[in-house]
Amino acid sequence: MLDIQQIQSIIPHRYPFLLVDRILEIEEGKRAVGIKNVSANESFFAGHFPEYPVMPGVLIVEALAQVGAVVLLQSEENRGRLAFFAGIDNCRFKKQVKPGDQLRLEVEILRARGAIGKGKGIATVDGELVCETELMFALGDKRAD
């Protein structure tokens, strides 16, 4: 299990764009399960939508991508690198995510060859499918400008 400080030591995302609160399970380089506690205070609810707050689907996908980044960047060989979101296939949204929901984020790395790879992401709330997708990634190094 990884807490928020440990997650922040692995991926560079920070508020308001850090969308993973905890990693519950992790198998290095293979898979992870994380959670996002969706609060009524999330900044995106101010505009999406004020009278009917719903978490934007693209942010659910981003939360899955961040869990995938933890899987990839936790390994010693990838420490300090960045995982870039390189593509998405077969994305489907099945249920809305609202304030008070706990989003369970499961990502399995399907293949990784060099700096390029693909993972499968599944997001659920209370055991019900919210989103499933395939995510492509590219690993890169931080540039010193």
Curated annotation (Swiss-Prot):
It is found in: Cytoplasm. Belongs to the thioester dehydratase family. FabZ subfamily. The active site is at H48. It is an enzyme of class 4 (lyase). Pfam families: FabA. HAMAP family: FabZ. GO terms for cellular component: cytoplasm; membrane. The keyword Coiled coil does not apply. It comes from Geobacillus kaustophilus (strain HTA426). It catalyses: a (3R)-hydroxyacyl-[ACP] = a (2E)-enoyl-[ACP] + H2O. Keywords: Cytoplasm, Lipid A biosynthesis, Lipid biosynthesis, Lipid metabolism, Lyase. This is 3-hydroxyacyl-[acyl-carrier-protein] dehydratase FabZ. PANTHER family: 3-HYDROXYACYL-[ACYL-CARRIER-PROTEIN] DEHYDRATASE. Its main location: cytoplasm. Its EC number is 4.2.1.59. It comes from the Bacteria. The keyword DNA repair does not apply. CDD domains: FabZ (cd01288).
